[in-house]
Amino acid sequence: MYDVIVVGAGPAGSTAAKTLAEKGRKVLLAERAKMPRYKSCSGQLIQKTLDLVERYFGEPVPLSTMCTPTENRGVILTDDRGNTFRFEQSGRNVWRSSFDKWLADKAAAAEAEVAKETAALACEQRSDAVTVTLKSGEHTYTEQARYVVDGEGVTGTLKRKLTGQEPEYITTYQTYNQGSIALDPHFFYAWLQPDLSQYDAWFNVKDGQLVLGVSVRDSERIDEYFARFIAYMQEKHGLRIEKQLKEDRWLLHRVRPGCPIDHGVGRVLFAGETAGFLNPMGEGVSSAIESGHRLGEAMEAHFDDPKAVLSAYATAARPLQDYMKRQWHLVSAMSDAFGDMKI
């Protein structure tokens, strides 16, 4: 039997696994994909994330995980009235495939057992343990643990099966392109005008590739909004696309007013986006790392008392939720579409 089975080797899961393994706990970190695996994400690590990585992983984000330009200098936001706001801070530009693998390798170095290409299909709780059904290739089997940490993110199934709740989603679509544009590649740009998206539209650069994307509530309208955004970028910023290299679609958790957080059910605890932590513009890495660490600390401090674990985790994670509320409140002042997010 494991002390803890962690599902999902993203920032939340790997941080929780490393934190608990360093405490001497027997930890299984199960990742359904082959690593390194692609993750649809801007890969812009803000200063807060860089500080957390140094604090919890003992070293700076390595250059091997980064793409060019390696330095991110902040965010430039355009509100729904066309006004531009510049928020400068130091950050890094990474490929999530490389960054997430590095985090999982750090968990493995702390003696967490990492099971790659292993999906968690279901879990069944008892008073003293959790039975998890896992599948690796054609082999389906079960493992037991005292606790489960669900860090699968928005596309995971364990939480939906446990709670019976179907989450609300935001659909994202982005393309990677060869071309040129009259914007500074060191910044992440976002636009909140309602004619360009139903959530936000964005631009950033990764290894010379121009990344352009939109997010919508109604997935059937994504092509319409994307075409409008491209036309806007051509007119306003001199976008010229020579060749589209890649496209992807993804889902985001739709954050509701009050930024509700679901910390877990019984012996199954939720971290990162699974719990509901997600900041504006899809920035979730900082809260994923911090929630994973705080969950691991709460679990270790009260290991024999599941109710105390859940309570301690909720208390420890409250500052993350408060930070999230403040961030969404700021965006609510920039776009009427987010008016219900005012504090």
Predicted feature locations:
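Beta1/beta-strand and adjacent pyrophosphate-binding region of the FAD-binding site
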Residues: 1-10
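N-terminal FAD cofactor-binding segment of flavoenzymes
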Residues: 33-75
